[in-house]
């Protein structure tokens, strides 16, 4: 069998994955086999958390709106506010409502009073 000279292909491949894992701690940034395993884990987590981030931000916006809107009245809540928004066909999404709730509560109170009529 003839000899195959691959040059620096393997070194280049290992260097590429070690650059990816250079910020990892311990053997996760030094040993090739553990680097590849941790790289797969990191990419899986990143893929999973891209969807989870959307979920978490939606929950945060809903919590912020609900916390502010409960100050309007005892029986008034987030779900009633959203229901009234849909009935009046106001196109305000949860992100915008949460920003209004944080920056200008009086504006959110005015919106809720207008749509309750």
Swiss-Prot record:
Localization in the cell: Plastid, Chloroplast
A GO term, aspect molecular function: structural constituent of ribosome
HAMAP family documented for this protein: Ribosomal_bL20 (MF_00382)
Cellular component terms (Gene Ontology): chloroplast; ribonucleoprotein complex; ribosome
Role summary: Binds directly to 23S ribosomal RNA and is necessary for the in vitro assembly process of the 50S ribosomal subunit. It is not involved in the protein synthesizing functions of that subunit.
Family membership noted in the UniProt record: Belongs to the bacterial ribosomal protein bL20 family.
InterPro entries: Ribosomal_bL20, RIBOSOMAL_L20_CS, Ribosomal_protein_bL20_C
Keywords: Chloroplast, Plastid, Ribonucleoprotein, Ribosomal protein, RNA-binding, rRNA-binding
Gene behind this protein: rpl20
Gene Ontology BP terms: ribosomal large subunit assembly; translation
Entry protein name: Large ribosomal subunit protein bL20c
């Amino acid at each position: 069998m003839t000899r195959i000279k691959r040059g620096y292909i393997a070194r280049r491949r290992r260097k590429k994955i070690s650059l990816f894992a250079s910020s990892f701690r311990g053997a996760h940034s030094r040993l090739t086999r553990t680097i590849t395993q941790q790289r797969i884990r990191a990419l899986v987590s990143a893929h999973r958390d891209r969807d989870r981030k959307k979920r978490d931000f939606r929950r945060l916006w809903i919590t912020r709106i609900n916390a502010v809107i409960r100050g309007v009245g005892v029986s008034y809540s987030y779900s009633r506010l959203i229901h009234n928004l849909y009935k009046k066909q106001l196109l305000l999404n949860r992100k915008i409502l949460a920003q209004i709730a944080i920056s200008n509560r009086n504006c959110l109170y005015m919106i809720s009073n207008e749509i309750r009529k």
